[in-house]
Amino acid sequence: MISMRFSYLLLLVGAAAFAADPSAGKKLAFSDDFDGDKLDEAKWSVSGAREVFTFVKVGKGSALRIGLKVKDDMIQTNTLTSRGKFSQQFGYFEASMRMHAGDGHAGAFRLSTDDDKTPPSITTSFHGTGKERVSPWARAVLDSGAQDFRPDKAIGKFTDISKKFHTYGILWTEKGFTWYLDGKAVHKLDRKEFVRPMSLTLTHRIEEQDRPKLILKSLPDDVDIDWVKVWK
């Protein structure tokens, strides 16, 4: 009996260890360490204000910083995307990011179907909204129209989303999507109809409905990306 219980415990430990590493058994298909002083345009395209994309020192290396452009209305979307240069069907997509601190703007790590206007397509993301908040989120375009998918409750209380780098990951399989924060599964969406390749996007934006919450004197308040990896 003791031996059987011990074997069962080993199985549980093994399963937990595997769950903590969704890249296990996969090969690296795409990566960027942002260790240079300019963007690799073979991997990325930029939209928005190009001048807000800069490189900053992080430890012995560097990170990509996506800032905000100060202008009259402040409405903006500054985006780095692999669309048209890299996309993939299924796999594990992850990024090490330090989110912004304040309210009124949003940083995001996002996967989107390449042709995201043709159903069935989907955008899945980790969405940071300031004040140490981050949440998994998805929006699908279906034959019946657009549909959002969100957790029923917050995935946790955080105190350091803007103070340190965390690893945000999305595992996409034939069965659906699982969101990981620092290797721990925090949300799941079981939908099988999304099968077309997806590309990776990193963004920092201010939308019109969020603008009243923005405190200009709190700027600069940036989103930093240490690295990106995609596993197949």
Regions found by a protein language model. Name each.
Residues M1-L9:
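Bacterial N-terminal signal peptides that target proteins for export
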Residues L11-A20:
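Hydrophobic h-region of N-terminal signal peptides that target proteins for export
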Residues A20-K232:
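GH16 jelly-roll
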